[in-house]
Amino acid sequence: GYGFLYLGDNVVSYFDPITGSQLTGKQFIHGSWRNIDEQTGLNCGLTEVSESGKTNTYYYDNYDGGLHTGQQYVNNSWHFFDEDTGRMYTRDEEVRRIVQFTLAELGGSESTAFGYLEEVRADGGSYCGYGPCMATVRHIFKAAGMSGFLADGFVDSWPHKYLDLMIEKGQHTMTPRVGMVAFFLWENSFANQIGVSADHAEIIVEVGDGWYKTVGAIAGGIKESIYHTAGDYNIGFGVPAFYR
């Protein structure tokens, strides 16, 4: 026989249709990359592979062994797998990816940011009539291919909805770290006027002693800002999946 064959003891392997020989290692079969161990057969689930003196982790489908890339929810946690190679990112690499996509938005116009409000509405979320700050945060995670990392893929453009949900999920802290979402409540803000918990959000790109730098949609476009950690306007930070 040839193709995928069950060899017993939960071992499935693949035999070349032309030569009949057993294929091992990384193989492109039926439109997907798969990894086949000579002894244990087709790899499924999270799999460590030794390559060029280092160990990388890949995620192979639990049913057919096909290689998964991009964001994946595995073992009760979000992870990102390189879109080309499938290699699982480290948590630090995931943070750097979000920062990279955040900085790429720097200098964007107000109209660009307001366009992200329309993106949220097109994706099924509600429209915040007070500005595009949260829609911009959500767009950055989506553009990075990491929408699941932000509140498990919740879609909306109101900052208070994200803050409330992330507190409920235990995804909230008062200690800023790079890649987190900073939430704000300004004095005499619309949030106070309408009775909600937050009225602004930006992404942290740098943290110092008593301060943190953000990128977000504010008056005039998408800009950098620096805030004091002890400021009364701080109401905490949303924790994306790479810190959980």
Task: For the regions a language model picked out, list residue spans one by one.
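Residue-level detection of beta-strand scaffold positions
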Residues: 22, 88, 125, 181, ...
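Hydrophobic beta-strand residues in large extracellular and virion-surface proteins
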Residues: 98, 102, 137, 141, ...
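Residues that flank catalytic or metal-binding motifs in active/ligand-binding sites
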Residues: 32, 77, 178, 198-200, ...
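N-terminal capping segments
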Residues: 89-149, 197
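Extracellular adhesion/carbohydrate-binding repeat motifs centered on closely spaced tryptophans
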Residues: 1-94
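Active-site or metal-binding loop neighborhoods of secreted/extracellular toxin and effector enzymes
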Residues: 212-244
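A mature extracytoplasmic/lumenal domain signature
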Residues: 19, 40, 64, 85, ...
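...with weaker cross-activation on analogous glycine-rich loops/strands in unrelated enzymes
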Residues: 147-222
